[in-house]
Amino acid sequence: MFRARITLAVLLLSLIPISHSHAADVVYPGDRPFTLVVPTTYQSGTPAPLIIALHGYTADAPYADSYFALGKAADEKGILAVYPSGSRDSNGFLYWNATPACCNFDSSSVDDEAYLLSIIDSVSKDYSVDPARIYIIGHSNGGFMAHHMACKQSERIAAIVSLAGSTYSNTRSCKPSSPVSVLQIHGTKDAVISFTGGYLFGNAYPSARKTIDIWGQINECGKKPARVLPRLDLDRKIPGAETTVLRYKGCKAGTNSELWTIDKGVHSPELSATFADNVINFLLTHPKKSA
């Protein structure tokens, strides 16, 4: 078990950060501090969108910041961006307590759902946050946590983006009371969280396609998703527009369930310059509406 976890950690730590600068960083102190990036265009009294960016297993908040590289696009769109860190497990690795599959390997009782809600409440107290535009993006374990929040806190979360994560295998564990737009992004060559689904230490997680099918049913979408053009260029290491878009239509309350498949993409793709714009555009076009 320990050796398997170390192997997983080594795979996840192979990511290469991308550095960039911010407009203004505000650090919230406490037992679990987090960083809020305030856009240069922010005006008190004008409700702004809020995005929470979640790192993967073994990574941390600064890594999520540099890897997703949302800074420029978020600033241009007037988005408040939050970068929190998970808890440390017995091996010293940071993780989120999301679904049974990933990545609370110590069976800890840590409540990350409550922690993320407290972040939303704290930022909303100090800044003008639009309650209809609260979003989460996560990579790997962070993607699992994004799905968890969509399942358990659907009244607060408008939409999520999961890169190389997955939702609950047991659909009885995901019974949201409100529709949530879901974008699943996954590489076909992911060797950590398989595109076709699988198990982590005996706990199942659904495939990328099954994940959006589950949300298609939850959001009462049309029977079958359809491919949408144009293809996208999300991975700068793969030539051309390598990513196909599969989209459910006719979903409840203007929501969506989409799969962006990175052909030959790995667990931690080298994200292109257009990645941030594409995912932020998805989020902003899916605010929370009355069901």
Q: Predicted regions: what is each one?
A:
Residues 124-128, 132-180, 191:
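Primarily recognizes the serine-hydrolase "nucleophile elbow" in alpha/beta-hydrolase
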Residues 52-58, 164, 186-187, 263:
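The conserved beta1-alpha1 loop
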Residues 27-41, 45-135, 145-148, 152, ...:
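Serine-hydrolase catalytic machinery in alpha/beta-hydrolase-like enzymes
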Residues 86, 188-191, 198, 263-266:
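Acidic beta-to-alpha connecting loop that harbors the catalytic carboxylate
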Residues 7-17:
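Bacterial N-terminal signal peptides
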Residues 181-185, 206, 218-291:
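C-terminal catalytic histidine-bearing segment of alpha/beta-hydrolase fold enzymes
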Residues 191-196, 203-207, 270-272:
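Conserved alpha/beta-hydrolase "acid-adjacent" motif
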Residues 21-23:
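Boundary at the C-terminal end of the N-terminal hydrophobic targeting segment
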